[in-house]
A protein has these predicted regions:
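Metal-cofactor-dependent catalytic cores
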Residues: 1-255
């Protein structure tokens, strides 16, 4: 069984609320056939009554929730759990607006709507998928991407390399841009954790939104397609052996 030379896991990212800013982690525990703990656990509806009628249906398509490609005004907002995961904290550009119990979050949605009503079609609601995630696919996968891919995208588009555009869970050290796109079907080991690499992550217009200014003046998605002849950055992966991973852990690929 062939093995690649060992390289490192550079960063771990969790995005507690779909479409909002995330947080970096130093370590996390991963379970078999599960998303990264706390990732996309919550989602905020657009305020549509049609969506609110379907809230008991479980996983729902991203069009029902606020997202960067449709509501760039969400840039700068965070909704994060406290250390005990008993309360949620609403922040805007790092400043706390308010906090409320995780199981009674209506005041948080009222505050968000009051501060920025133009990004909603009505009063939003906070949805929660306990034990699951509001990822773009209903499959319980995580996402990972190579450092060289982020760097090369930045070079081609004249933008700083920034995972906030792509919202990947794991950034791994790579030498060649987009080499990970050829890893489908391979097994990755990070510490005691193993993952099966599944398929590329297709990108949408959300990557056009500047994560600092919320402006989307440049068609970065179009530049990506013209330069690379594809719009993929990152790979989906399925956890096959549980365990703990930490930044700077070394990883290996087997085939």
């Amino acid at each position: 069984m062939a093995k690649d030379s060992s390289r490192t896991l550079q960063s771990i990212w969790r995005f507690p609320v779909k479409g909002l800013m995330g947080q970096s982690l130093s370590c996390c525990n991963l379970a078999v056939n599960a998303s990264l703990p706390g990732d996309r656990e919550y989602a905020i509806t657009t305020g549509s009554p049609i969506t609110h009628e379907k809230l008991d249906a479980g996983w729902m398509n991203k069009r029902h929730f606020i997202q960067l490609c449709a509501t760039s005004g969400v840039v700068g907002w965070q909704l994060l759990p406290d250390e005990a995961h008993e309360h949620l904290i609403l922040l805007h550009h790092g400043t706390e607006i308010m906090r409320a119990p995780a199981n009674a979050a209506t005041p948080l949605m009222e505050a968000l709507y009051q501060h920025q009503p133009e990004i909603f079609s009505g009063q939003p609601r906070l949805c929660r998928m306990s034990g699951d995630a509001y990822t773009d696919t209903p499959a319980p996968w995580i996402s990972l991407g190579g450092s060289a891919s982020l760097a090369d995208f930045g070079k081609v588009t004249s933008t700083p390399p920034d995972n906030r555009r792509f919202r990947l869970n794991l950034i791994i050290e790579t030498e060649t841009p987009f080499e990970e796109l050829d890893w489908a079907g391979r097994i990755m080991t990070i510490g005691s954790v193993t993952l099966e690499i599944i398929e590329p992550v297709g990108r949408c217009a959300a990557i056009n939104v500047d994560p600092d200014t919320a402006r989307a003046d440049t068609d970065l998605l179009g530049m990506m397609r013209n330069h690379y002849n594809h719009s993929y950055l990152g790979m989906f992966a399925r956890i096959t052996t549980a365990g703990k991973i930490c930044c700077s852990d070394r990883y290996q690929l087997t085939s």
